[in-house]
Amino acid sequence: GPANIRRRVGWQHAERAGADALVVRSVGSDIRRFPHTGMMSSDSDGEWAEIPVIAVSNPDADHIRRLHELGEDINFTIRSTAGWRGEVVSGNVVLDIIGRETPEEIVLIGGHLDSWDLGTGAVDDGAGVAITVAAAELIARLPQRPRRTIRVVMFGAEEVGLLGARAYAAQHAGEV
C-alpha cells in the first residue's frame, strides 16, 4: 500500500532534500518495539540510497512525534550493520499431484518460503504455506486423484521482488 511505497522510495526524496538519514515509521501494527522490516527500491537509474534508512516501531514513532510537538530538539545516533551482502541462491519447491483425466491441465496453489528478519514468518507466509500444504495433503488422500494436475509451489525470494514466482512464470510460460 501507500505506506510501503513511502518506505521503498522515501530515501530518494530525503536525499534530494539534503537529509543525512531517513527514519521511517513502521508500517506494522506491533505494539512492541519491533519495527516492521522491508526492502527499499532503487531509483530509476538503478542507484540505491547513500544515506542510512531505518525503521522505528510505532511506540517509538509516537514518542518522537510527541517530542516534536513539544518543540524538543530531536537528535539521532544511528548504528546499523545492515547492508548488501551479495547475491545468494534461492529456489522453489514444487510438488505435482498428477491428474487422472487431463494431467496436462495444471491447477497451481502455493505460498512463499521467505520472511523478514524480525518476523517469525508465521503470518507472512508460514500460514499460507501451512494451508497450501494441508490442502495438498487432503487432495492426495482423496479416494481418487483429481481430474487435473494439482501443482503445489513454494516460492523462494518473494520478499525481495517475487523472484521465485517470476522465475517460475518465465520457465513455465508455455503452460499458462
Task: Annotate each predicted stretch with a short phrase.
Residues 17-22, 103-107, 146-150, 176:
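Loop/turn elements at helix/coil->beta-strand transitions in domains of secreted/extracellular proteins
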Residues 25, 110-112, 153-155:
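Generic beta-strand/beta-sheet core signal
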Residues 29, 60, 159:
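Residue-level detector of flexible, active-site-proximal loop/helix-junction positions
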Residues 1-45, 50-52, 120:
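Extracellular/luminal Protease-associated
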Residues 3-7, 13, 89-92, 115-176:
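Acidic/histidine-rich catalytic neighborhood of metal-dependent amide-processing enzymes
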Residues 40-122, 134-137, 141-147, 170:
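Soluble metallo-hydrolase cores and metallopeptidase-like ectodomains found primarily
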Residues 30-33, 86, 162:
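Short, well-ordered, mixed-charge alpha-helical segments that flank or form enzyme active sites
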Residues 22, 53-57, 152:
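Conserved beta-strand scaffold positions in the cores of enzyme catalytic domains, especially
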